[in-house]
Every structure is written in C-alpha cells, then in structure tokens.
Regions:
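Flavin-dependent oxidoreductase catalytic cores
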Residues: 1-222
Length: 222
C-alpha cells in the first residue's frame, strides 16, 4: 500500500515560501497535501493581505494545497469557502477543531469547539445544509480527542459520522495536553474503528521509525 503523507500547518512557519522550498528540496511529489496555516474569517468578509499571499495560486503552483479555516460560525465558514472556490479555485477546506491556544479556545474555536459537542453538531449541520458546500466543497476536519478528558470523544465521533467529511484528521491528545504528554492511542484506535470517514493520524511523527510504528499499529490509517 502506498504511504500517504501530509504536511501539517504551523502558524508562522509553513507559509507558501516554506512549502515551496520543502517541496522542491525534499517533497518532490511525495507529499499528498500541504495544509496552510489557518485562515480566521472576519466580519468584513475579506482576506488579510498575508492570507491572500499564502493562498494565491501562483504561490502554490505544482503542490497540492488545502486551506485550513478556523471559525465556529457556519456563515463565516460558508462565505470563506465560496471565496476560496470562486476566486482561488480551492475545492477542499479543512476545519481546525484542534488548535489548543488559550486565546483560541476562550472563543470556542479550535479545540474549544469540542467543549460543547451540540454546538459542533449545529455548526456542521448548518455547513452541510448549504447547497454550495454540498455541491462544490470537500470538507475535512482536524480534531483533538477532547478538552480536559476524552470521555466525550465517542459522542464527538458520532457527530462527525453524521456528515460526509472528506476525512477526519485526529491529533490524539487533549486540548490541555497542548503538544506534551503521551499520545492517546486508545482514543485514536476508537476513531479508526468507529469513524465513517477516512481517518488520518497526526502528531509526534518526528522520525521514519515513528511513522513506521504508527503504520504497523494502525495499518488501515493514513
């Protein structure tokens, strides 16, 4: 089976300059998708200059780029998707439901969306009720397994299962873990066994051995 490798986004690091340099020197067609640092929609319904530079097709020529969006407002997600499709030609958007930053979580964005699963459900329901989204946009989600505990993770998976996600990218840590503590591989295993969407592993892949160990433990995952 062919290995599928993505480059996860890191704010302030993996901009278009980095992505293009990495692809030219190391990637060479081996990276299936490069994810942009998140766009955070604003009420002006316009992208910031730095966001425009990062998503400009001329700056992403020859690489498969997926734009990540962070919002808890379905209307903001939809206009962002429409603009990305109409003006920049993107037909896949990744929802950030994983960022652990305190300033993000305090606004119930990023992994803060997992605080209230019913609101997450309401958000996704509104997104997929939109005709434009259903007809034109592939929506994937980057998620964690909970905020302070993983007890609600089965409920969160049930919510994701209600919608036709392109894929579910799981970082198997809690929001309170940030990027420390051990990966919760039991929670990831639950996602693999119970998700209706394709599940993609994210987190702590620092070496080839890390990668091969995960592939061995979860051969059905990307």
């Amino acid at each position: 089976m062919k290995n599928i490798i993505y480059m996860a986004p890191m704010e302030g690091l993996t901009d278009f300059t980095f992505r293009n340099a990495y692809e030219k020197i190391f990637g060479k067609g081996k990276i299936a998708n490069y994810f942009t640092p998140f766009i955070s929609p604003n009420k002006s319904e316009k992208f910031l200059a730095r966001e425009i530079r990062d998503i400009d097709r001329e700056h992403n020529n020859g690489i498969n780029t997926v734009v990540q969006v962070m919002t808890n407002d379905a209307k903001d997600f939809i206009w962002t998707a429409r603009m990305l499709y109409d003006e920049y030609g993107y037909n896949e958007i990744n929802l950030n439901a994983g960022c652990p930053s305190g300033t993000v979580v305090s606004k119930n964005k990023g992994s803060g969306m997992l605080n209230e699963p019913k609101l997450l459900d309401k958000f996704l329901d509104a997104v997929f009720e939109d005709d434009f989204i259903r007809e034109n946009i592939k929506v994937s989600v980057k998620t964690r397994v909970g905020v302070e505990t993983d007890t609600a993770f089965p409920e969160i998976i049930d919510i994701y299962n209600k919608y036709p996600l392109e894929e579910l990218i799981v970082h198997p840590r809690l929001r309170t873990d940030f990027y420390k503590n051990d990966l919760n591989l039991e929670a990831y295993d639950y996602a693999v066994k119970n998700s209706r969407s394709k599940v993609v592993f994210n987190g702590d892949i620092f070496t080839r051995k890390n990668f091969l160990d995960i592939k061995k433990k979860f051969p059905q995952t990307d």
